[in-house]
């Protein structure tokens, strides 16, 4: 109510009522979707995506403005099948303002090093041509899409 625009960057993985209240109160959500295949999601992240997808649908029903961010991870979610599945999922939502295609990066490496953990992702950049093809794929499904975010 103080005139400050609040944006929250989230992967949507929460069952906390307090965290959900924060998401509901935000003016804009930057919501990361890494994949829709539940088995692959659990194998690669250690967690099911069930809660993530439930929260995504809940916030969509509330017409909460969202920028969906899709980190493209080679060997995990970079297939046409998985990306089309993500786009089809997003087509069911009511408040997607834009889709950001996020090419693979190593920004998380420092966090792992600080926690004395092994950073298991190996550098595998997504070519500019592939990034553009993914952008076109999402735009063909009606989404305003950009590379980067």
Task: Describe each PLM feature range.
Residues 120-130:
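Short, flexible active-site recognition loops that position polar ligands and cofactors
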Residues 4, 117, 143-144:
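Short aromatic/hydrophobic-glycine micro-motifs
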Residues 130-149:
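A cross-taxonomic marker for long C-terminal extensions/tails that follow the last structured domain
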Residues 113-121:
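Short glycine/proline- and charge-enriched loop/turn segments
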Residues 1-107, 113:
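Conserved AdoMet/S-adenosylmethionine-binding subsite of the radical SAM
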């Amino acid at each position: 109510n103080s005139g400050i625009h609040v944006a929250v960057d989230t992967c949507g993985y929460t069952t906390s009522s307090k965290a959900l209240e924060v998401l509901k109160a935000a003016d804009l959500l930057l919501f990361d979707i890494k994949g829709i295949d539940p088995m692959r999601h659990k194998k690669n992240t250690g967690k099911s995506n069930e809660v993530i997808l439930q929260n995504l649908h809940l916030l969509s029903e509330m017409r909460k403005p969202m920028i969906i961010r899709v980190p493209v991870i080679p060997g995990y979610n970079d297939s046409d099948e998985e990306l089309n599945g993500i786009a089809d999922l997003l087509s069911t939502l009511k408040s997607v303002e834009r889709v950001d295609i996020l090419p693979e990066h190593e920004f998380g490496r420092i966090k792992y090093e600080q926690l004395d953990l092994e950073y298991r992702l190996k550098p595998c950049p997504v070519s500019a041509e592939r990034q553009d093809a993914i952008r076109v794929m999402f735009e063909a499904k009606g989404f305003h899409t950009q590379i980067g975010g």
